Amino acid sequence: RPLRPGKILICIFALAALTTATETDLQRILRDGNDQFTAKMLPEIVKENPNKNIVFSAFSVMSPLAQLAIASAGESRDELFSAIGFPNENVTKAVFTDLNRELKSVKGVTLKIANKIYIANGFELNDQFAVVSKDVFNSEVQKLDFAQNKVAAKTINTWVEDHTNNRIKDLVDPNSLDDYTRAVLVNALYFKGSWKNKFDKESTIDRPFHVDNTKTIQVPTMHRSGQYSYGESRELNAKIIEMPYEGDETSLVIVLPNTVDGIHNLLEKLKDPKVLSRVEKDMHEIDVDVYVPKFKIETTTDLKKVLQNMNIKKLFNGSEARLDYLLKKSDALYVSEAVQKAFIEVNEEGAEAAAANEFAANFSSFTRDRNYLIVKQTVRVFP
């Protein structure tokens, strides 16, 4: 069966920890939480990037939010746990401990997740939070003089580059750091995988790409025929294909609307966090004639605005945030800035993707071939 593209590319790099039939309770909680968080985040990201090709990782945002939830109190804490879909601190710690252990065993691809907390000179992490950050999230800790904002930003950005194979650059703007910055939480995720069945470069030629119902352009498009897990969904009015990487534990899932203007309906359907799981159950191995454009996308997202629209509000309010357990000194802290930079490239050899997030905690000044591809990276964790 032919699978041909059309219109503007929308790409989600949603690295999800999934499992086979022998899924454990912790893996189910993580999968459900990630699906729920991604479904909420997707429309907000699209709203912030109208008519653009986008890439983002909801999964990589969950780790720093989970850390902040554990460091929070009151309504700040409630909002964060509700957003990430975990019932309480103990479950959250168990889920991320299990995840970090399982990801070390993923075969056939390069997959790295790193966390780091930078704190201002003269301050210390809360003792209990320091233990959780190290044991659960594998977070490194480093002191910085944020008043030297250019030096501090360069230090953080160099760490991000080192942990994303130089794909994510200039995550932190020096102007976002100053004397009032007390801590910066940074998360970096990097993935690189080779296709189990590679595309022949000689088969890549310019083919029509439908920007909309009236405009068509030529773009380099890969082609391969072979057996893939494939499905056609009436619910989504779309075709779905899963393209495995080497090792058979990771894959790229592509959802293609049946009509040139079908992306808007598809995005509405994807607000249901369970819809892809339902659709994937009906996929089967068949011979497929696959056409996929080569693409490279980079997106910078103002997470502060996105997360506020997802009902994480107290965290960013200088008079209402309760980050009581982040530092030993009980300064009135709030998150002044949250940014994600994400990158993905897909070519004949495979795919490379990276994402990095920055959450800056400041001393509160109040107390002083169609919009056409939806792409999901999956990691199958075998217990």
Curated annotation (Swiss-Prot):
Superkingdom to which the source organism belongs: Eukaryota
Pfam family, one: Serpin
Site location (Reactive bond): 363-364
Disulfide-bond pairs as recorded: none
GO cellular component: extracellular space
Keyword Amino-acid biosynthesis listed: no
Position of the signal peptide: 1-21
MF terms in GO: serine-type endopeptidase inhibitor activity
Spans traversing the lipid bilayer: none
UniProt-listed InterPro entries: Serpin_dom (IPR023796), Serpin_fam (IPR000215), Serpin_sf (IPR036186), Serpin_sf_1 (IPR042178), Serpin_sf_2 (IPR042185)
Keywords: Protease inhibitor, Serine protease inhibitor, Signal
Family note: Belongs to the serpin family.
Protein name: Serine protease inhibitor 3/4
Natural source organism: Lonomia obliqua (Moth)
